[in-house]
């Protein structure tokens, strides 16, 4: 099975390694910047890297010919409808919440802010609306008392994401089927960016 990986930074680079170890061919990597960590890892592995002209949009031309699936791993770029049409199964991404809860860029922060006792992660189909595509796989974990968003991400949700992405790809490779369970809109919530406090020190 051949995929195109769209992503960035630590999560994208680690997902790349996990997918390659599974024996799945990464035909192309798409990144927002040439010096991105994912770009460096892909180039070291001999994989072609495409740097987006517009870091907010993935055009069809960025997707490798013959890709069966597009995988988004920490990508803030929207994968266009035309790009999704280039892959047999379209695209999937990982979101660190139990979708449809906490749709948005700050899902882990809102999980902690709202005092959720349970968190989770979802592999979902990329779609026109952000984080609203059908669910391919989910798992959950408890949130520890006093745990920060960063701690929760590093302890549980990032490792969960790598595992779920690999499990979904492994199953698609074996069965030719990508599960698609529609999200229940009755339970949808938003997780927009949380502004830093006005008196927060500069970094």
Regions found by a protein language model. Give the residues of each.
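N-terminal Rossmann-like dinucleotide-binding module
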Residues: 1-33
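Structural motif
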Residues: 6-9, 32-33, 53, 73-74, ...
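Hydrophobic beta-strand scaffold residues
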Residues: 26, 48-51, 90-91, 119
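Conserved nucleotide-sugar phosphate-binding/catalytic loop shared by glycosyltransferases and other
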Residues: 31-56
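Short, charged, surface-exposed secondary-structure boundary motifs
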Residues: 37-40, 60-61, 101-108
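Short amphipathic alpha-helix with an adjacent loop that forms part of the alpha/beta core around
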Residues: 56-66
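Donor/substrate-binding cores of folate-linked one-carbon enzymes
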Residues: 69-192
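Acyl-group handling in specialized metabolite and lipid biosynthesis
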Residues: 194-203
């Amino acid at each position: 099975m051949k995929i195109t990986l769209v992503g960035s930074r630590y999560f994208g680079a680690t997902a790349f390694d996990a997918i390659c170890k599974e024996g799945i061919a990464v035909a192309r990597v798409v990144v927002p910047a040439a010096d991105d960590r994912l770009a460096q890892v892909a180039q070291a592995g001999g994989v072609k890297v495409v740097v987006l002209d517009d870091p907010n949009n993935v055009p069809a031309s960025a997707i490798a010919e013959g890709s069966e699936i597009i995988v988004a791993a920490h990508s803030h770029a929207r994968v266009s409808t035309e790009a999704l049409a280039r892959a047999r199964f379209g695209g999937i991404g990982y979101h660190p919440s139990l979708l449809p809860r906490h749709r948005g860029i700050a899902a882990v922060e809102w999980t902690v802010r709202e005092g959720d006792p349970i968190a989770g992660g979802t592999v979902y189909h990329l779609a026109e609306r952000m984080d609203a595509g059908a669910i391919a796989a989910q798992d959950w974990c408890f949130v520890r008392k006093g745990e920060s968003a960063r701690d929760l991400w590093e302890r549980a949700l990032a490792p969960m994401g790598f595992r779920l992405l690999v499990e979904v790809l492994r199953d698609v490779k074996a069965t030719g089927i990508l599960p698609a369970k529609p999200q229940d809109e009755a339970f949808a919530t938003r997780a927009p960016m949380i502004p830093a406090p006005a008196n927060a020190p500069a970094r």
